[in-house]
């Protein structure tokens, strides 16, 4: 283990969390501090002895502070391989042993709706990333710290060794390069979003990520599997309950993508990423009643997502059974008080508009990463082809639209039965279509009379239509495209069932 002693430190930070405590420790150890700009003033205000960069360089800040640290006496002191160097001595350059820098808040400023282009440009840090990269490149002699959460370990090492171990310096260098890479990626994303001269890109490209946070999860789908969540930033507020699990995140993702499909108040219940109950109505309370009654057995212990704020009245209903997670764009204060009685339930608030928007889906396989456009196709009844039966009534069309929206989010082979804005039966993940239909219709039972049915893919045989006639289904929507389509069309016509072809398949694996 190699220890590099710390005698001289350069500090320049935007985020001043923990700075004074750290600087005080450095001062007490007799370390020389050099700083600039707001960091310098902050340290001086707290009575900590510090040299200014101007005193070191003999050159003032210029261009309203745009150029402060870009000077050989700063970067020579960071990049020098050895402390004793004739070239440095001849130029009166002293080395730095530790660089503590974090950057202008470019991404936060960029995301402000009111931010001007000039304000965004001024928050592109130049000197900071240059110092960070220089120190990280020279990690075998120089420490670099970009994250205030590392100050505690940094202080511990300084107290123990009056320096930093090579292992710790290398870890800090890795974090530093990650920090500057993410920073540059955020800047690229900004220019990408405002560039009006880009060529039209029809080719689907693997998305580029700016993953700022890594959250360790208790385990994966099962307790023997390790897991973590990588995300750009946390976009939700958890009001109560234990931390969200790997399975929770998958189920929440499935639930919010479906509930976001509806303009009217809607509630979606999900189990193992499949919807088990969906309700659409004029009020969020009525929508929940429909979702619950659609499958009162499966909803127990599930995930419930709402596309409207949770009211006190709805909260009272939600506390009648055990739910693992409740998601909504907002919770009324009294609703949160009601939900506290279910301490085991995780209550999560999120902006659905911001959460649902990924245009690309990615799956890891043994061959590599599969990348595809997300299925955001919305039903357009005016484009459907009526191939059997009479024109559906307006209320049947409404239900067909709801069923078509739901079936897109169900694992294939998928069948959904709907009546009056309520899912009555959902057949998910079956190896044959008639099996999925039988599950959905049996769950619907007697309520299937005058219901509608949606399928995520065509009927290879007319057996699904035969089942529909036995259960009293009045209308069917499916993609069509089977070699035996005519068999299904003929049976639908014969049994008085209206059937539409959409030409759009919705497989989900």
From Swiss-Prot:
Listed EC numbers: 2.1.2.3, 3.5.4.10
GO molecular function, a single term: phosphoribosylaminoimidazolecarboxamide formyltransferase activity
Pathway named in the protein's UniProt entry: Purine metabolism; IMP biosynthesis via de novo pathway; 5-formamido-1-(5-phospho-D-ribosyl)imidazole-4-carboxamide from 5-amino-1-(5-phospho-D-ribosyl)imidazole-4-carboxamide (10-formyl THF route): step 1/1; Purine metabolism; IMP biosynthesis via de novo pathway; IMP from 5-formamido-1-(5-phospho-D-ribosyl)imidazole-4-carboxamide: step 1/1
NCBIfam families according to UniProt: PRK00881.1 (NF002049), purH (TIGR00355)
Domain remark from Swiss-Prot or TrEMBL: The IMP cyclohydrolase activity resides in the N-terminal region.
Family in the record: Belongs to the PurH family.
Record-given protein name: Bifunctional purine biosynthesis protein PurH
Organism for this UniProt entry: Natranaerobius thermophilus (strain ATCC BAA-1301 / DSM 18059 / JW/NM-WN-LF)
Recorded name of the encoding gene: purH
């Amino acid at each position: 283990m190699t220890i590099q002693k710390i005698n001289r430190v350069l500090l320049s930070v935007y985020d001043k969390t923990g700075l004074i405590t750290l600087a005080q420790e450095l001062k007490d150890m007799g370390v020389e501090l050099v700083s600039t700009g707001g960091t310098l003033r902050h340290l001086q205000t707290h009575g900590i002895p510090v040299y200014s960069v101007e005193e070191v360089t003999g050159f003032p800040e210029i261009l309203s502070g745009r150029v402060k640290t870009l000077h050989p006496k700063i970067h020579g002191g960071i990049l020098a391989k050895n402390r004793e160097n004739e070239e440095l001595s001849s130029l009166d350059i002293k080395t730095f042993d530790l660089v503590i820098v974090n950057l202008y808040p470019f991404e936060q400023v960029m995301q402000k709706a009111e931010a001007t282009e000039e304000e965004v440009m001024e928050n592109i840090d130049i000197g900071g990333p240059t110092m960070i990269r220089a120190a990280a490149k020279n990690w075998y002699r120089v420490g670099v710290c970009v994250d205030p959460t590392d100050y505690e370990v940094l202080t511990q090492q300084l107290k123990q060794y009056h320096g930093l171990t090579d292992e710790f310096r290398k870890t800090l260098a890795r974090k530093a390069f990650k920090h500057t890479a993410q920073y540059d990626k955020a800047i690229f994303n900004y220019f990408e979003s405002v560039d009006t001269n880009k060529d039209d890109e029809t080719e689907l490209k693997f998305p580029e990520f700016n993953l700022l946070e890594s959250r360790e999860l208790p385990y994966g789908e099962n307790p023997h599997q390790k897991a973590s969540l990588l995300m750009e930033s946390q976009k939700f507020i958890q009001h109560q309950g234990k931390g969200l699990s790997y399975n929770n995140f998958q189920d929440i993702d499935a639930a919010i993508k479906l509930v976001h499909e509806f303009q009217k108040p809607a509630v979606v219940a999900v189990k193992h990423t499949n919807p088990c109950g969906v309700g659409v109505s004029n009020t969020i309370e009525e929508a929940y009643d429909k979702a619950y009654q659609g499958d009162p057995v499966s909803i127990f212990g599930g995930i419930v997502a709402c596309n409207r704020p949770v009211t006190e009245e709805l909260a009272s209903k939600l506390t009648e059974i055990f739910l693992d997670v409740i998601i909504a764009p907002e919770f009324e204060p009294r609703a949160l008080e009601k939900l506290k009685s279910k301490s085991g339930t995780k209550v999560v608030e999120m902006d659905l508009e911001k959460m649902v928007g990924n245009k690309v889906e990615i799956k890891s396989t043994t061959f590599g990463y599969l990348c595809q456009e997300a299925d955001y196709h919305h039903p357009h009844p005016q484009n459907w082809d009526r191939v059997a039966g009479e024109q559906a009534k307006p209320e049947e069309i409404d239900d067909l639209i709801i069923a078509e929206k739901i079936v897109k989010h169900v694992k294939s082979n998928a069948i959904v039965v709907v009546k009056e804005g309520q899912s009555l039966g959902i057949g998910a993940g079956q190896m044959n279509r008639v099996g999925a239909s039988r599950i959905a219709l049996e769950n619907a039972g007697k309520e299937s009379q005058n219901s509608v049915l949606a399928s995520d893919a065509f009927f290879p045989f007319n057996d699904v239509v035969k089942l529909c006639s036995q259960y009293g289904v009045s209308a069917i929507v499916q993609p069509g495209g089977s070699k035996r389509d005519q068999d299904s069309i003929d049976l639908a016509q014969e049994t008085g069932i209206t059937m539409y072809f959409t030409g759009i398949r919705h497989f989900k694996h």
